[in-house]
Amino acid sequence: MGCTLSAEDKAAVERSKMIDRNLREDGEKAAKEVKLLLLGAGESGKSTIVKQMKIIHEDGYSEDECKQYKVVVYSNTIQSIIAIIRAMGRLKIDFGEAARADDARQLFVLAGSAEEGVMTSELAGVIKRLWRDGGVQACFSRSREYQLNDSASYYLNDLDRISQTNYIPTQQDVLRTRVKTTGIVETHFTFKELYFKMFDVGGQRSERKKWIHCFEGVTAIIFCVALSDYDLVLAEDEEMNRMHESMKLFDSICNNKWFTDTSIILFLNKKDLFEEKIKRSPLTICYPEYTGSNTYEEAAAYIQCQFEDLNRRKDTKEVYTHFTCATDTKNVQFVFDAVTDVIIKNNLKECGLY
């Protein structure tokens, strides 16, 4: 009879080959689809990272899209100057010039026009005079004692440009805008032959209950921490230090049983703000046991250790840490390139292709 196969056996062999081929194709397809979850406390820079993905991987914001951000730029600018003026009352700081009190009253009267995306020359003049005032600057230098947008000085220092009638926000202006994320924002893009699905979820405590259904099938978690938050308290709980809240949250994510096989990427963000702040605000505000110097390198390395030490599975799970400045496109591009290489390697391993 020899080794000839019956028609039935041949069909079985073909079926087996087809199953193997399908399994491999499914594995390759899974390896090519990447689900990224962006987590972190409120105002840690998650949404800015998402905006950078659009700039880096999707040709950025069109002129029409930029125009839509004009109202947000104006709103952020006015919210910032109003926050400073209100804090002056609480901190008992007087205006450098008495006439500025009239400007402050005018500010509250005129502020409404900016909500429609219009900044009148009268309103711009009022804000400029207030921002130049010695008392306002003294209050701004104490911004850790109240809630203020990171982008406050960026917009207020550039009022001449942003108050022009023909003003169109730049990509950088868009990156600097702050809108509280509610719910889940999903972004898709392709990079290095991978199809990315990135989910940005609100960081405030009230938003966290919405995270849970995003967790299934996650390839990697990018956890954002604002380094510059070490001397600040939460917007939603003024008793809680923001860095301590971040550590608590990172601990619960990093050691969660659902994420045993999920890559954890730690973005220690706002390194530019941290570098400036550490010169005048000691790290002991957050970590009383810290005995090192208040230099960027030593203080940043200490914070990195505090987070990495929370990983209770060091022997089997690695935390990939990067120092980032989410508003710097080149920095984010460089870091995300390195992150993608780690994801490719880990993803292929999981699918048995590496």
Swiss-Prot record:
Top-rank lineage group of the source organism: Eukaryota
Presence of keyword Nucleotide-binding: yes
One GO molecular-function entry: G protein-coupled receptor binding
Mutation effect (residue 203 to A): Reduces cell migration by 50% and increases mitosis six-fold
Positions where lipid (S-palmitoyl cysteine) attaches: 3
Listed GO biological process terms: adenylate cyclase-inhibiting G protein-coupled receptor signaling pathway; adenylate cyclase-modulating G protein-coupled receptor signaling pathway; cell division; GTP metabolic process; negative regulation of apoptotic signaling pathway; negative regulation of secretion; positive regulation of macroautophagy; positive regulation of superoxide anion generation
Region of interest (G3 motif), ranges: 196-205
Region spans: G5 motif: 324-329
Cell compartment(s), UniProt: Cytoplasm; Cell membrane; Cytoplasm, Cytoskeleton, Microtubule organizing center, Centrosome
Start and end residues of each G-alpha domain: 32-354
Record Gene3D superfamilies: GI Alpha 1, domain 2-like, P-loop containing nucleotide triphosphate hydrolases
Result when mutating residue 45 to V: Fails to bind GTP. Prevents endothelin-mediated activation of GNAQ. Results in increased frequency of developmental defects compared to wild-type when ectopically expressed in Xenopus laevis embryos
GO cellular component, one term: plasma membrane
Keyword Hydrolase recorded: no
PROSITE patterns, alphabetized: G_ALPHA
Keywords: Cell cycle, Cell division, Cell membrane, Cytoplasm, Cytoskeleton, GTP-binding, Lipoprotein, Magnesium, Membrane, Metal-binding, Myristate, Nucleotide-binding, Palmitate, Transducer
The protein's assembly and partners: Heterotrimeric G proteins are composed of 3 units; alpha, beta and gamma. The alpha subunit contains the guanine nucleotide binding site. GTP binding causes dissociation of the heterotrimer, liberating the individual subunits so that they can interact with downstream effector proteins. Forms a complex with CCDC88A/GIV and EGFR which leads to enhanced EGFR signaling and triggering of cell migration; ligand stimulation is required for recruitment of GNAI3 to the complex. Interacts (inactive GDP-bound form) with CCDC88A/GIV (via GBA motif); the interaction leads to activation of GNAI3.
The name this protein goes by in its record: Guanine nucleotide-binding protein G(i) subunit alpha-3
Source organism of the structure: Rattus norvegicus (Rat)
Gene behind this protein: Gnai3
